[in-house]
Amino acid sequence: MRTIDDLQVTGHRVLVRSDLNVPLDHSKGAPRITDDGRVRASVPTIQALLDRNAKVIVCSHLGRPKGAPEEKYSLAPVAERLAELLGIPVAFAGDGGGDIAGDRAREVVGQLAEGQVALLENLRFHPGETSKDTVARATFADELSALAEFYVGDAFGAVHRAHASVSEVPKRLPHAAGRLVLTELEVLRALTAAPARPYAVVLGGSKVSDKLGVIRALLPKVDALLVGGGMCFTFLAALGHPVGASLLESEMIDTCKDLLAEAGDRLVLPTDVVVADRFAADAETAVVAADAIPDGWLGLDIGPASTAAFARVVAGAATIFWNGPMGVFEFAPFAEGTRGVAEAVASGGGFSVVGGGDSAAAVRILGIPEDDFSHISTGGGASLEYLEGKTLPGLAALDV
């Protein structure tokens, strides 16, 4: 896989596919970025190209617009933050419409001097970006490619998507992987090749079905697989325990039984949970044994005994991969499981990887220093699919 050091970019236009998909708060007028982690992660690649006097054209998606412009998903606020981080102006090529690589983009790109940068409007405002129709994707890829002479893929959080800007544009331009993608791959290879032992994986999140592939892939490789979050209740049901009104995937119970039988004592479930009488921050709560959840109550976090037990396993591990919160951490009464696990992962002496997505958001929301972890991934879904052993379209396109 080529790197940007292999490209002769001085004086040339370089299209950089970054992942600037950040959360925005629209509640107080002008949109405000609430977590700029992905913007910051994109800077090293962009800066390296600017240092080589390239003309840099950054593109990204944000949110899930339906192939048409939606003002709330505009990348305009991201252009402002990117300019602050780079310390130079960022020319924004958005015109409020869906012609992402059209006249406005060509005008802005045409005015770039060496060492300057522009940002295109949200790629998903164009229906061709995510279209399942190969002709539509190819047509949009042609439009994007016409803006540049080189392509750099640096959107690790999107490499599992067969989207025009991710897997089609590299077929049309000399290309390389960006700094972020190479760093992410180095970390994931360390988790899959020969991880130092003991190797502990902590999985949370809502659904077993979302994590089934990675559970099956990791079970033979790990010394401990700790399961929390909403997905733990389907496992508890598989053991015959009542789960009240907790999140339950009934169709996955037999699968969970099989996984429990295969894993033996390597698959660790909570022994206590925090339950609530309703899904709300001000709900009545109680800590109960994991096999005694009352009828009508919802499990919304792992309990204090489970948090301590999970932390002990993590503290003794030489390699830790954590993906998914232990509870509804957005509500203070149900954040302690996630906080306890995050602090254990951060303070342990092992090689610690946070698998992106909600886990990375939790680290920042809970105020845990990011430098306390060996690596915080920018790609939740991409990380999981890589660990499953799947072929990721965006990586495959760069590796030719």
Swiss-Prot record:
Pathways per UniProt: Carbohydrate degradation; glycolysis; pyruvate from D-glyceraldehyde 3-phosphate: step 2/5
EC number: 2.7.2.3
Organism name: Parafrankia sp. (strain EAN1pec)
GO biological process: gluconeogenesis; glycolytic process
HAMAP family, A to Z: Phosphoglyc_kinase
Coiled-coil residue windows: none
Full protein name: Phosphoglycerate kinase
Main subcellular location of this protein, as a coarse class: cytoplasm
Gene3D superfamilies hit by this protein: Phosphoglycerate kinase, N-terminal domain
InterPro entries: Phosphoglycerate_kinase, Phosphoglycerate_kinase_CS, Phosphoglycerate_kinase_N, Phosphoglycerate_kinase_sf
Family, per entry: Belongs to the phosphoglycerate kinase family.
Single GO cellular component term: cytosol
Gene (name only): pgk
PROSITE patterns: PGLYCERATE_KINASE
Cell compartment(s), UniProt: Cytoplasm
